[in-house]
C-alpha cells in the first residue's frame, strides 16, 4: 500500500496539533508535495547536511527544530540552509517540522524525556489553557415565556452536552425594571417600577454559534431589552503543555539520579551537570525537554525535588539556587529532545505498520562536539 505525504501529515497533526505551537514558531511542511508518495520517514532533532545525507530518495525527514524560523528571506542554493532545501527538493525528499507543538502535545517531547529517565508522569508542569470553545448562556425571561425561549435557543444549537441534547438548568426569581420615556415595555408601563416573576435559564452552546443563539433568543424573548449573560468557558487542561512532573520508582540521592541521567541519555560533549545537595533524596522530578529556564519559577512552586532541562543560563540558575531547594540538572539541548525521535517514530509505525519504513537518525547534532577534558569527539 502506497502512503502519500498528506496521509503522514494527517497523522502527525493529530499527534502534535499545530494549534499547540507558539505564535512565533514555524511548524508543518517545509518542502514537499502532499500528493507525492512517501517511501520512508527519517526522524531527527535537526536538519543538518549529515542528517539529510541519511534520508533516502522520496523519503520524508521529520525534525523537531525548524530549519527556517527567524529572519528567513531567501532559500538560495548558495546559503547554508537554502542548499539543504534544494537538495531535498531535487531528490523528491520532503521536510516536516514538529517543534513547540510537539513540546506541548501529550505525549510529547517532555513525556519522552521523562520516560527515558525512568519517571512515571502524573502531571503537566505548565499546562496549556483549554480553548474557550463553549459559551454558557444565562437568560432571564418571564416565567410564562421561558419554554419558548428555551426551545428557540435549542433550535439555534444550544443545549448539547456530550451525547445529550436539550440540556438546561433554571431557577425561579424576580426581575425588576423601570421603563423610561421612549421605551416600549412588554410588561408594565413607562415610569413605573415593575417586578416580574422570571426564570433564570442556563444553557451551553458552541462559541461559533453565538450570533445564531443571540438572534434566536431575541426573537423569542418578549422583552425589548432582554437581560442575559454570556460566559466563555475554558475547559480544564487535558494533559498538554510544557514540561512534565513524574515519580521515580523509589527515592534516590541526587548524585545517583544524575548518574541515571548520564546513562539514560545519549552522550554529548557537555554531558550532565547539576546544582544541589548531592545527598538530597529525589523522588518527584520535573522535566522539560529543550531550553527550560523560563519555567524555573513554576518549578520552584511545584512539589518536586529536582528539575531536568537544558540550556540553563548562569544568572537564572543562580537566582533559583539562592531561593529554592529544588536541584537543577542541566543536560545538552539535543540530548534532552532526542528521546522524542523514538516516540514520533512509534506514532508513525503504529499507524502505518510495514507499509511505511520509519527510522531514527542517531547522528548527534548538538553544536558542542568536543569535550576538552577527555578529548572525546562527539561529531
Curated annotation (Swiss-Prot):
The keyword Metal-binding applies. A divalent metal cation 1 binds at residues 64, 103, 337. GO terms for cellular component: cytoplasm. It comes from the Bacteria. The keyword Metal-binding applies. GO terms for molecular function: metal ion binding. Keywords: Metal-binding. A divalent metal cation 2 binds at residues 65, 333, 337. InterPro entries: DUF34/NIF3 (IPR002678), DUF34/NIF3_bac (IPR017221), DUF34/NIF3_sf (IPR036069), N-reg_PII/ATP_PRibTrfase_C (IPR015867). Belongs to the GTP cyclohydrolase I type 2/NIF3 family. Homohexamer. This is GTP cyclohydrolase 1 type 2 homolog.
Amino acid at each position: 500500500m502506497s502512503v502519500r505525504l498528506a496521509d503522514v501529515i494527517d497523522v502527525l497533526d493529530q499527534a502534535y496539533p499545530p494549534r499547540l505551537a507558539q505564535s512565533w514558531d514555524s511548524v508543518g511542511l517545509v518542502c514537499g508535495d502532499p500528493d507525492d508518495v512517501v517511501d520512508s520517514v527519517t526522524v531527527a532533532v535537526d536538519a543538518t547536511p549529515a542528517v539529510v545525507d541519511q534520508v533516502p530518495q522520496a523519503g520524508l525527514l521529520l525534525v523537531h527544530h525548524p530549519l527556517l524560523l527567524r529572519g528567513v528571506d531567501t532559500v538560495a542554493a548558495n546559503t547554508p540552509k537554502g542548499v539543504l532545501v534544494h537538495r531535498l527538493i531535487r531528490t523528491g525528499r520532503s521536510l516536516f517540522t514538529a517543534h513547540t507543538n510537539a513540546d506541548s502535545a501529550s505525549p510529547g517531547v517532555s513525556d519522552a524525556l521523562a520516560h527515558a529517565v525512568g519517571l512515571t508522569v502524573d502531571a503537566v508542569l505548565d499546562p496549556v489553557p483549554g480553548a474557550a470553545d463553549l459559551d454558557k448562556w444565562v437568560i432571564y425571561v418571564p416565567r410564562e415565556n421561558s419554554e419558548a425561549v428555551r426551545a428557540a435557543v435549542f433550535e439555534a444549537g444550544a443545549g448539547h452536552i456530550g451525547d445529550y441534547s436539550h440540556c438546561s438548568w433554571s431557577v425561579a426569581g424576580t426581575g425588576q425594571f423601570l421603563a423610561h420615556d421612549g421605551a416600549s415595555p412588554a410588561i408594565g408601563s413607562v415610569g413605573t417600577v415593575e417586578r416580574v416573576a422570571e426564570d433564570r435559564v442556563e444553557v451551553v452552546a458552541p462559541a461559533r454559534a453565538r450570533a445564531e443563539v443571540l438572534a434566536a433568543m431575541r426573537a423569542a424573548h418578549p422583552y425589548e431589552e432582554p437581560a442575559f449573560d454570556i460566559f466563555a468557558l475554558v475547559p480544564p487542561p487535558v494533559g498538554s503543555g510544557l514540561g512534565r512532573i513524574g515519580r521515580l520508582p523509589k527515592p534516590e540521592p541526587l548524585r545517583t539520579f544524575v548518574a541515571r541521567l548520564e546513562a539514560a541519555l545519549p552522550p554529548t560533549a557537555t554531558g550532565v551537570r547539576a546544582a544541589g545537595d548531592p545527598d538530597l533524596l529525589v523522588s518527584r522530578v520535573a522535566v522539560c525537554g529543550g531550553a527550560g529556564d523560563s519555567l524555573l519559577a513554576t518549578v520552584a512552586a511545584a512539589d518536586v525535588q529536582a528539575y531536568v532541562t537544558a540550556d540553563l543560563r548562569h544568572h537564572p540558575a543562580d537566582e533559583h539556587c539562592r531561593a529554592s531547594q529544588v536541584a537543577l540538572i542541566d543536560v545538552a539541548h539535543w540530548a534532552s529532545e532526542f528521546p522524542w525521535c523514538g516516540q514520533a517514530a512509534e506514532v508513525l509505525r503504529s499507524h502505518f505498520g510495514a507499509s511505511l519504513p520509519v527510522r531514527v537518525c542517531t547522528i548527534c547534532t548538538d553544536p558542542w562536539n568536543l569535550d576538552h577534558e577527555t578529548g572525546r569527539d562527539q561529531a
